[in-house]
Regions:
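Amphipathic alpha-helical transducer elements in NTP-driven molecular machines
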Residues: 2-6, 47, 86, 133-144
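Structural motif
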Residues: 40, 101-103, 144, 152
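Conserved motor-coupling elements within RecA-like helicase/translocase cores
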Residues: 66-100, 107, 121
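Short, well-ordered loop/turn elements at secondary-structure boundaries
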Residues: 32-36, 80-83, 95-98, 145-148
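Conserved helicase/translocase motor-coupling segment
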Residues: 1-55
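Conserved nucleotide-binding/hydrolysis micro-motifs of P-loop NTPases
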Residues: 44-47, 91-93, 106-110, 148-149, ...
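Short mixed-charge
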Residues: 18-29, 58-83
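Helicase C-terminal subdomain and adjacent C-terminal extension
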Residues: 29, 111-186
Length: 186
């Protein structure tokens, strides 16, 4: 997921004319070069993976103290607003960006569940092991409402389209169905 997000974000944030046309189609907005971007994950390890993947494109770098940071040219828009933020759901509370990538992280071949999940008799515990933070309605709400124009969820569509997903995280399944119905699943 991190590499997919990095490639798309790099294309969009460094847009040429063909990408600008594509972004205009997505956002219905002519002011594409001034778009802001957010990358949200439920897990800090995935945030670091996204930073690392974006380093290849010159969008992120390591600071002198070893922490990750966004390269200067991608930090702010001309009007001073934040251009790019990468972080966990909690870092996005109260924030909005034109385009948000939501990295779901969770994936599982439902036919090959590990024994500790497959043998779990309590449905709620099984769901928690499979979906983790996705089951937090507050976090899911924050993660799926930070975009002004485009929400691009990156994850395992098959996993999101299972009965256990529908039972555990109905909002995610409903969103998947909406995207499928509107023809915007990539």
């Amino acid at each position: 997921e991190a590499k997919i997000i990095a490639r798309r974000l790099s294309d969009w944030i460094k847009s040429d004319e063909s990408t600008a046309d594509y972004m205009k189609t997505l956002t219905h907005d002519d002011r594409q070069p001034g778009l802001s971007f957010g990358v949200i994950s439920f897990y800090k390890a995935q945030v670091f993976a996204v930073y690392k993947a974006l380093q290849k494109y010159g969008i992120t770098e390591r600071a002198q103290d070893g922490t990750w940071q966004i390269c200067q040219e991608y930090r702010f828009l001309d009007n001073g607003e934040e251009r790019l933020r990468i972080g966990t759901v909690d870092a996005f509370q109260g924030m909005e960006f034109d385009i948000v990538f939501l990295s779901m992280v969770r994936s599982q071949d439902m036919n090959a569940l590990p024994p500790h999940i497959r043998n779990e008799e309590d449905d709620k515990k099984k769901q928690q092991k499979l979906f983790g933070h996705l089951m937090s309605e507050n976090r899911l709400c924050v993660s799926m409402t930070r975009q002004k124009k485009v929400l691009a969820i990156v994850g395992d569509g098959v996993f999101a389209n299972t009965q256990i997903a529908e039972d555990a995280v109905p909002a995610l399944k409903n969103f998947y169905d909406l995207c499928h119905e509107k023809g915007v699943i990539l």
